[in-house]
């Protein structure tokens, strides 16, 4: 009887030890799983700034919030972008180091293929990056239609087939009109400055014939260079580019007389 009771005692003790070991394993496994879950759910306090040239992912989740300082964007996990470009609902924004959207003019490093530091313009109210032609404080500027950086210099702008050349100030970027003497570089390394004329109304570079301040001028096709000291058909463009009329000129050893329409009436 005693032996039987002792056997039952040890058998139960063995079972209890196994249960405790199993329970301990479950406890530690549960603790580890909880730790992993906790680590993966910890909200980030800051986001990485995209490197220049990195393509942005379009975000639609989150909430716009406006406070006394300005607008900022809050993600579902409570984090918010700062010191970086963001594409939200297909529009581009730049968030400053406090997380607020940038408005007006800002010099920044590009966010996609354009890696240079350039000027950008953000809507004064909404903060979205502007593209294409923009009238700002009475002046016209042109921003890349895809990446938004301000263009400078002589640029061909417009849809295929109707593109025209414009002169955007090399520093300020505002569209220029009227007369400008601009450089043209050739394949042999030579650079020559030519007079060109940009329409006072829409700023496009003029080609062909144009009457300016009462005088006729001719500008070459393709380059828009003012013709000078040269014949164009039956008309003669003087050194200053004006078409000869109502006068007699000595040209290559001969005297040419021009009527009021610029037609040669006599040669001596």
Predicted features by range, described:
Residues 3, 8-268:
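Extracellular adhesion/carbohydrate-binding repeat motifs centered on closely spaced tryptophans
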């Amino acid at each position: 009887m005693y032996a039987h009771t002792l056997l039952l005692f040890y058998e139960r003790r063995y079972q209890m030890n196994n249960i405790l070991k199993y329970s301990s394993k479950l406890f530690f496994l549960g603790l580890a799983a909880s730790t992993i879950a906790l680590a993966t759910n910890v909200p980030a306090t800051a986001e990485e700034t995209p490197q220049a040239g990195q393509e942005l992912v379009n975000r639609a989740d989150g909430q716009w919030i406006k406070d006394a300082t300005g607008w900022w964007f809050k993600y579902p996990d409570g984090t918010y972008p700062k010191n970086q470009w963001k594409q939200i609902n297909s529009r581009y924004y730049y968030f400053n180091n406090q997380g607020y959207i940038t408005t007006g003019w800002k010099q920044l490093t590009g966010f996609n293929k354009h890696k240079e530091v350039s000027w950008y313009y953000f809507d004064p109210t909404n903060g979205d990056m502007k593209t294409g032609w923009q009238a700002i404080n009475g002046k016209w500027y042109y921003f890349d239609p895809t990446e938004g950086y301000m263009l400078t210099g002589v640029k061909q702008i417009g849809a295929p087939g109707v593109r025209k050349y414009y002169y955007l100030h090399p520093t300020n970027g505002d569209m220029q009109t009227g007369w400008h003497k601009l450089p043209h570089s050739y394949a042999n390394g030579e650079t020559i400055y030519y007079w060109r004329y940009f329409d006072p109304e829409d700023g496009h570079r003029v080609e062909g014939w144009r009457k300016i301040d009462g005088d006729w001028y001719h500008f070459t096709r393709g380059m828009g260079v003012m013709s000078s000291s040269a014949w164009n058909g039956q008309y003669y463009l003087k050194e200053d580019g004006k078409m000869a009329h109502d006068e007699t000129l000595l040209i290559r050893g001969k005297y040419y007389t021009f009527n009021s329409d610029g037609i040669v009436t006599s040669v001596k």
